[in-house]
Amino acid sequence: MPVSASLAYKNYDYDYDSIQPYFYFDNDDEDFYHHQQGQTQPPAPSEDIWKKFELLPTPPLSPSRRQSLSTAEQLEMVSEFLGDDVVNQSFICDADYSQSFIKSIIIQDCMWSGFSAAAKLEKVVSERLASLHAARKELMSDSSSNRLNASYLQDVSTSASECIDPSVVFPYPLPESGKSSKVAPSEPMPVLDTPPNSSSSSGSDSEEEEEEEEEEEEEEEEEEIDVVTVEKRQKKNETAVSDSRYPSPLVLKRCHVSTHQHNYAAHPSTRHDQPAVKRLRLEASSNSNSRHVKQRKCTSPRTSDSEDNDKRRTHNVLERQRRNELKLSFFALRDEIPDVANNEKAAKVVILKKATECIHSMQLDEQRLLSIKEQLRRKSEQLKHRLQLLRSSH
């Protein structure tokens, strides 16, 4: 907002209610203008007509809470206000300059003598053109900082166009800043929106020509920016298209893996039904799995997900086979131990303990039998030797 933005860097804590009324109804204000004009020259014949246009701008919005503006930003704001001819002089100038502005020849003679006003306007416009061309050259070297300030100053100018001020047709000389930001060309200029109530025809013609030249230059700059934005959108679209092309084969491969997993689920039921032919069926299933894997390698490229699933399935098959073989070995061991041979519900720990005891007892029996065998062999040797002695004696 131009009013609040111009006041923000001066005082943050001013009250909203302290703003004066926006129409002059008192006689004190009329005396003030009358007194100011009386110091320089007699009142002009247009004084009564001019009283009808004594209006302040529309009321400002809430006080701004922005940070304090630097000197460069203040100069940018003043140059923007001068470029749009919208902001009232009392909000951007001090008290001394406001008095000199009231004494200006443009105000005194704007209704009747158009020659002096036209000369004054041409002088101001020529100075403003020179400053704008110098500022645009500096803007080309520092485009990044100007883009940040452009959005801020664009909001200021758009909200400024909503204010109605009779002083918009009276430009006044102020120190121009070294910078000037561009405004969107799609928005019409404020001077064209508010008709010049008290300016001469020559002054309005010069202002309109000046604004047309500025609009053409700003349109060229905006066209360059539009080209950049179109290229960025095309890059984003290309990246989006390239991202959307890749995940489709992964989904197809995952569906293929899920169907292949379903084929493995049929084998365990046959294993439990007929344990005698488990190894034969496991070998046949492993051969069929290897054939399926070879066919898939030939038809489609393997991905990391499919390889992990194949490894997982192979591990599950081998683990199931190992458990079945272990169970069969426990059953065979249980049948060999007399203590638990008839106990079908014997636990694996009980089977192992009984098997250990049975082994120890069998080892003792073996040693005892070996000692008996040795005794019998010696006895047989003695008997053979005695038999030979008896034969030799006869």
From Swiss-Prot:
Chief location of this protein within or outside the cell: nucleus
Where found?
Nucleus
Glycosylation sites noted in the Swiss-Prot or TrEMBL record: T58
Check the record and name the Pfam families matching this protein. HLH, Myc-LZ, Myc_N
Q: Where is the bHLH domain?
A: 310-362
Q: Is Protein transport among the key words of this record?
A: no
Q: Subunit structure, briefly?
A: Efficient DNA binding requires dimerization with another bHLH protein. Binds DNA as a heterodimer with MAX.
| Entry protein name | Transcriptional regulator Myc-1
